[in-house]
Design a protein with these regions (language model features):
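Enrichment for repetitive, rod-forming helical segments
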Residues: 9-11, 165
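Sec-dependent signal peptide recognition
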Residues: 2-9
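N-terminal signal peptide c-region/cleavage motif recognized by signal peptidases
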Residues: 13-16
Length: 175
């Protein structure tokens, strides 16, 4: 799995947002109401194009058989709902297909009943087993530990067989 993600990361080279000129302009920071387009993509009012969460991959809707992609999208939507859909995103880069990659957080009570605090959506999706680390070789300059956090929680989630890991490891039928 790691080799697959590494090779895919090489194919999906990223260019820092400041250096990318032919992908259009997005604000460096975007805040507002958002909803889940897929397990790793957000859309918001007055936000074009949608933002992909930096550092992760989730099953793509329409590209994979079974309900894994729907479960990943539902997990992201549940996270957004718990934060009343209020999201804060910082643009990290554009990928070679000019998709905006962003680090996005919500303020929510996780676990339920705890004090509300900021949570990185990508880290939470990986921790819950609905996404895996991808393209971690160039972390955001403001969060040098972002790659390590995602890799750490991916390892824990995989070992615990959370979310979609039994399917990804071939231990269960397609969800």
């Amino acid at each position: 799995m790691k080799a697959h993600a590494f090779l895919a990361g090489l194919l999906l080279a990223t260019v820092p947002a400041a250096a990318q000129t032919n992908c259009g302009q997005l604000p460096k920071i975007w805040e507002g109401p958002a909803y889940a387009v897929s397990g790793d993509t957000l859309a918001g009012i007055d936000l074009k194009p949608p933002l992909k969460l930096w550092g992760i991959r989730a099953p793509a809707l329409g590209n994979e058989p079974g309900v894994g992609a729907m479960r990943a999208r539902a997990a992201l939507e549940d996270m957004l709902t718990s934060a009343e859909h209020k999201v804060s995103c910082r643009l990290v880069a554009f990928d070679r297909e000019c998709r905006a990659l962003a680090q996005c957080t919500v303020t929510a009570e996780w676990p339920a009943g705890s004090k509300a605090q900021p949570h990185d959506l990508a880290v939470r999706l990986v921790e819950d087993g609905f996404a895996y680390g991808f393209g971690l070789e160039a972390p955001p300059p403001w969060d040098k530990d972002a790659s390590a956090k995602i890799a750490h929680f991916e390892s824990i989630s995989r070992q615990a067989r959370k979310g979609l890991w039994p399917h990804w490891l071939g231990e269960a039928p397609k969800p």
